[in-house]
Amino acid sequence: KNILTLLFVLFGGYSLHAQDTCYGLLRNDTLTIGNNLVERTFLWNGGNIITYRLTDKSNGKSWKNHSLTPDFRVTKDLPQPSNGSLKVVPVKETKIFPAYLKVEVSFSLEKLDIKRVYRIYDDCPAIACDTYLRGTVNSIFGGREVSAADRKNIEFAEDMKSKEVTAVLDQFHFQGQHWHARSVEFSDVTDWHNNLVFEKEIISYRKLGYRGNLLFAFNGEDNCGIFFLKEAPCSSIQLAYQGKDFLTDFGKFTVTGLGITEKDVTPDRWTKTYGCVLGIYGEGELSRLQALRSYQKNIRTYRADRDEMIMMNTWGDRSQDSKVNESFCLKELERAARLGITHFQIDDGWQIGKSPNSVVARGSFKNIWDNKDYWKPDPQKYPRGLHPIVKRGKELGIEIGLWFNPSIQNDFADWQKDAQALISLYREYGIKVFKIDGLTIPSKEAETNLYRLFNKVLEETDEEVIFNLFERSE
């Protein structure tokens, strides 16, 4: 039989390529992707694919999808898809990203081009999907939030058919009436929040929305099920947020909220939405957590000498930036060594520029680059630069890290200057670990520029630099 690898444009054939256990196969009207643990089968539908079946290979359990609509939706209308194509490409491992098989499904809905990129990893019971849009959108994503006071009781059958949120990242519709779920929401900004994880137990029986980045769904008859992981910021700070991330409706589970508006989609470039991961697990809590952890281990290549750390930060004694200087840091390094600290991070105060949190001289995060020396070591505090600190750290087996706050004004328009400042610190002092702080991301353009900053630094440092927060970005 004829098997094409790497690239396939649909005209009634099929494509297969394996990354060890990973595969992508298109035969006639059926697309199948998976590995040795999980398989997801789709109806091709001109490229606007519809999940047909999901299989857990570890226990032989298979679920048929009872929805007849495409997995991804940006409008309530369903125009005929065109230009459907498939690419299957093995992606090599880098210093920070593991190898995976990329299965790229592209199609058009009138003037809108859509690209769904599936990431499949060996020995992982989950498949990730990144979505990109380009062109013109003739609809408004999402709808008006329904007030709780306007909701009717379960006896009102028509109310059970409440309007579905238009924008859908992914969905699966199980058979049966005994489905349960657990949503998990997270909070950031730890200066203000001390309760960081919120879980909600759900008995799915009608269409309701829930907040969170994680949804576990399982059948009450055998406790086996799936999880959806929405790869996005915390719910409270997502872009274009409609108040919910997941919808549950008996056995139907939906991921919603793209993180963009129709105005962010243009004909001249691809715009990425928030990502989504669908994973499967067997019976019990341990199986759920192991499945999730298996995927998380594939987000970044693990290297013990780089990624394991016991970090000490100078901000912790509540003196803010009033104490940090060469003498203080050298003394702290000696104590850190006795405690077994592996990384010593100098927080706000090491630099010439003053932040709004400074007790020495009130500064600002706005117009940082009015002072071209903002991100150089303060000569009053560090007359010899950071060289003595780095040198003593190496002697004690402690790596030095720094605090850094990107220039937030105008959607991170100065990202290139910020990137060069980080690159210069790496080249002069060998600083690899940076705490990125104070981020405010008000728009898709700001998010894009922030990714550009991170990617530029990684490119120029041969992926040696480590940020405390960084998501995969192509």
Residue spans of the language-model regions?
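Sec-dependent N-terminal signal peptides
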Residues: N2-Y14
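N-terminal accessory beta-strand-rich subdomains and adjacent acidic, glycine-rich linkers
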Residues: Q19-S294
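Conserved, mostly hydrophobic/aromatic
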Residues: L37, T131, D268, M312, ...
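Feature activates predominantly on carbohydrate-active enzymes
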Residues: K102-S108, K115-Y118, D123-C129, R134, ...
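Short, flexible loop/turn elements at secondary-structure junctions
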Residues: L109, D122, L133-V137, T314-G316, ...
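Alpha-helix termination/capping residues and helix-transition junctions
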Residues: D123-C124, R335-R338, E428
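An acidic-aromatic substrate-binding cleft motif
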Residues: E285-R335, L339-H343, D347, I352
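Aromatic- and carboxylate-enriched substrate-binding clefts and catalytic-loop regions
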Residues: Q345-E474
